[in-house]
């Protein structure tokens, strides 16, 4: 297998923070707390943790194995390891998924900038609950403002990716991730100090095993899979920048712990604040852009400055979570174009950003001015459906089958143990999960996401 000279992360902490940044995203904040609170609290969290460490980490290690062994972008890595370019279809699925996800995810990321501005200008003050609904609908359906924020947001991942692995991705991760941690801890402490916050803590953390059933188990598996950025090529691309001393198992464990830490702390922000004013939180964009602005104003309404600061910090937190995810998605496609077509990183990044501008504009317009339907879905929802419900589970499944069944066990063992320098007594269990449990789990996630088990 021919390997090319390749950039690498300059430190182990840089590699861990970059990989964790890929995993931490908006889903940690707008989906996990809702799922946990409504499906058994601590019982769901325990189930989720089991799914992360039993299913998620082995798949993550498998992606790390492919990337570091091949020392190539995900679009080329599988073919290089198999000595057969036909296997590149697995990596290309991740490249295409990353490109399409960027097209609509960046739109939502741009919304966070609008809400940062609204926080700074005290635009949420003196509004009634129904005003937040009208304001969000008016903004998201506007043909101009969301597009302006989309373009503004895309500048940041583009600039960071152009700067390269060490000076761009690693350096930014060492800044963005600690700031994100500080913000989420400060916001959680402030939220838990509110009156009646204990009701929110009880809702999130009190175990209710009576709510745990097959549907909740499938939901926990799905949340673990999507939260860790599996199946989209980000982790294998980043792993291609790992040095030979990086311990894949330890790195995967660190990423899993950080991702879960952020998700739980997001719940400690949302539920105490919501219950302090008697509001039942929902999930998704409506939670972030309708419910929470209302919650923050009511919770701190007696002190407008505090309401403004809390809201500002929260939307900065959201923007950072979105940015770390989009950097990794952008890098997946940029690295592939750079290697496959021998073009400069700058030109490759320009092509990716240009595509994101086009698909982002179409995604944004499909929420309002452009009402065209594809299979009964608007363009934004179509991209979300095709990537989240089809491409990512399929990509994760193919990674499991490739590493579990096709790739030589000796290759997996060498990568996991750094050629025998580290011990890996769990290797047989890891291979069993990768061969049998993980594929079955992903198939169940796939059919559940499509609603076939309902």
Task: List each model region and its residues.
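Loop-to-transmembrane helix boundary motifs in multi-pass membrane proteins
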Residues: 8, 13-14, 22, 147-148, ...
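Inter-helical loop and helix-membrane interface segments of multi-pass membrane transporters/permeases
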Residues: 3-7, 35-39, 69-93, 106-162, ...
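A generic transmembrane alpha-helix motif of multi-pass inner-membrane proteins
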Residues: 378-401, 423-454
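Membrane-embedded translocation segments of transport machinery
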Residues: 2-5, 9, 170, 174-323, ...
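Membrane-interface "cap" regions at the ends of multi-pass membrane proteins
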Residues: 1-30, 59-64, 68-81, 85-92, ...
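Transmembrane helix-boundary motif of multi-pass solute transporters/channels
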Residues: 11-49, 199, 236-239, 250-253, ...
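Select transmembrane alpha-helical segments in multipass membrane proteins
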Residues: 8-19, 44-47, 86-99, 147-153, ...
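Helix-loop-helix connectors at the membrane interface of multi-pass transporters/channels
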Residues: 1-2, 6, 109-141, 241-245, ...
